[in-house]
């Protein structure tokens, strides 16, 4: 009879420490994408690997309430709370989009205690590229 090979990484052993929380991140980049319908806040390290993210929809806001400034403030607070626990002290902020949540998200980031090195607006602007869609008639 063949001998059974003992499994080293079996489920019975469980996790030997969570790998995600072991990495300390002193500096990062906070990306805020504010559209008219939703606000998405993504926190990455300086190389661009996602550490934490949150949106107004994941915070429990549904429908038109996702585009409100309060929803953006809540989403930014949720995304930043996890990275502050991982040791982030300094961050750069990139804001994209025309939505109502731009200023509210930035206000929540400032209140979190993270030192901001710079705030940059990276909203894509066409240099007369594609023709825009026709105007809405309501």
Swiss-Prot record:
Any one Pfam family match given in the protein's UniProt record, by short name: Ribosomal_S11
Gene Ontology cellular component terms for the protein in this record: chloroplast; ribonucleoprotein complex; ribosome
Biological source species: Daucus carota
HAMAP family: Ribosomal_uS11
Record region (Disordered): 1-23
GO molecular function: rRNA binding; structural constituent of ribosome
Alphabetic keyword roster: Chloroplast, Plastid, Ribonucleoprotein, Ribosomal protein, RNA-binding, rRNA-binding
Protein name: Small ribosomal subunit protein uS11c
SUBUNIT field: Part of the 30S ribosomal subunit.
